[in-house]
Regions:
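Protease-domain processing segments flanking chymotrypsin-fold serine proteases, especially trypsin-like
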Residues: 2-69, 230, 236-258
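Sequence contexts marking disulfide-bonded cysteines in secreted/extracellular proteins
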Residues: 17-19, 63, 80-82, 173-175, ...
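Conserved catalytic-core segment of clan PA serine endopeptidases
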Residues: 35-47, 56, 88-135
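Catalytic histidine site
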Residues: 42-95, 177-182, 213-214, 258
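Loop/turn elements at helix/coil->beta-strand transitions in domains of secreted/extracellular proteins
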Residues: 47, 71-73, 154-157, 207-208
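Solvent-exposed loop/turn segments at secondary-structure junctions
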Residues: 58, 71, 81-83, 96-98, ...
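Chymotrypsin/trypsin-fold serine protease catalytic domain
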Residues: 121-196
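Catalytic nucleophile loop of clan PA
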Residues: 192-222
Length: 258
């Protein structure tokens, strides 16, 4: 399991004062993966990927990707990463600390009707509209956004970048080949994608083809991650978010089978 927003709310008071030393940076492998067991490693921040913070503290709880959108202020994450009535902020390319000017407030949450109705893991994705007091858009500051694609076919090589649950630190990354789990969920064999990496985008070039979430909130075993299969639902969700209408109230209950 990759820690739902509902569970994290109860941890905020306990962990907000905890610190973490950032491990040395590496870079995602430049060659296709082999049969050798893969493990995520620290990577340099990507300005198109950032950390989500729930509550007023410094604890980052999930990951999100900056989207290429009409207004430039939309991000994509897992639906189980958001909870109703909880202030949420986002920092693109987060590393160790954040300048106040780089902190974006979540202004609206857009959810698939299947998630709102029953927390269907096939619809475990959310688009968030963000705002801040400065000039320019989030997408401009990130140097561009990621486009939403379709679910990867088995054997597709993808990169995943995410932030483990904690205070400070930086991202980890992995490059691996996707597989297909029962129920139609894309899966990604790679160790070290721990709690907090929910919402981490699975990318092929500038295209997001999945995100850590879906089956069992992204997986009960950190050696295998899952994604909700990107379908017409995520495309429709982007269109609704770009239209700028009112968002949805995120459910306050989420459970998995872990």
């Amino acid at each position: 399991m990759r820690v739902s927003a509902v569970l994290v709310v109860g941890l905020l008071a306990v962990t907000a004062g905890c610190g973490r030393t950032a491990p040395p940076e590496t870079h995602a492998p430049s060659h296709p993966p082999t049969a050798t067991k893969l493990t995520a490693a620290p990577v340099s921040p990507d300005a198109r990927v950032g950390a989500l913070f729930l509550g007023a503290g410094d604890l980052h709880t999930c990951t999100a990707g900056v989207l290429d959108s009409t207004d430039g202020n939309l991000i994509l994450t897992a639906a189980h990463c958001v909870a109703g009535g909880v202030d949420t902020t986002f920092v693109a390319g987060f590393k160790d600390t954040a300048d106040p000017a780089d902190i974006w407030r979540v202004d609206a949450v857009y959810l698939d009707p299947r998630w709102v109705a029953s927390q269907d893991p096939l619809a475990d994705f959310a688009i968030l509209r963000v705002e801040h007091d400065g000039a320019g858009t989030l997408e401009d500051g990130a140097g561009g956004g990621l486009t939403i694609g379709t679910a990867p076919k088995p054997g597709t090589v993808v990169n995943v970048t995410g932030y483990g649950l904690g205070v400070g630190g930086g991202p980890v990354g992995c490059r691996s080949q996707t597989e297909l789990a029962p129920g139609g969920f894309p899966s990604l064999p790679c160790g070290g994608l721990v709690d907090g990496t929910s919402g981490a985008p699975w990318t092929t070039g500038p295209t997001i083809t999945g995100l850590t979430g879906g089956l069992d909130g992204g997986g009960c075993d950190e050696n295998v991650s899952y994604s909700p299969p990107f379908d017409d639902g995520v495309v429709a969700l982007l269109a609704r978010a770009e239209a700028g209408g009112p968002g949805d109230e995120a459910p306050t209950v989420f459970d998995d089978d872990c």
